[in-house]
Amino acid sequence: MNAGALKEDLEQSLKKLQTDFIDIYLLHRDDPTSDFRPILEILNEYHMAGKIGAFGASNWSHERIDEVNQYALEQNMIPFSVSSPSFGLACQYNDPWGGGCISIAGRKQVDARKWYEDNHIPVLAYSCLGGGLFSGKVRTSDLENTKSCLGNYAIRGYWCQENLERLSRVEDLASEKGWSVAQIALAWTMQQNVVAFPIVTISKSERIAENVKATQLKLSKEELLRIAGYER
């Protein structure tokens, strides 16, 4: 990505969306070898012109975002204020799509989550249901027949023993409480120390209503730890 390409993309986005303002604009997939400074300047330019609101990145490491924001602070510029990594109960054990997918889920990403918490950067959490692993369609009692509902990327990225054991614990809690597996997975994501907003792909209207109810569900600290297997 370079400044010229970013300007072209921004103008194309405004045109295709038939709007003169984009509320949240995210850069996708970082190239750590590229110079972020001209990119940050363009984003600031479009923000000051009233064409974009908040801006940030998807699949950028927290270290890279921190570097951007430190520079922005030094130059009296507007920093990144939002990020979209993979985050949820499913730990990413392989890169689902290739090309540098960033996850902040699981035991190994404690430092990343602490950075988001300390810097008050909200997370737009993609794959918060593990590509469907925690949608309720996959059942640990019948993995042979229910695994087929997942796409190849979900199997590649999230199908592992640790996640299946976690799914089993969620199923048990769902049975106890009369909630769905997806509701518990979404509630867990929203009740972490990181301020997270789950992004979910839904094909049926009834699923929308079901998932929205997750915003009203409350899990105890013991339940949060029980299903994840690690501290927040």
Each language-model region and where it sits:
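Short, acidic/polar
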Residues: 1-17, 66-70
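Active-site groove signature of glycoside hydrolases
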Residues: 14-35
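Beta/alpha (TIM)-barrel catalytic core signal, keyed to glycine-rich beta->alpha loops juxtaposed to Asp/Glu
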Residues: 34-232
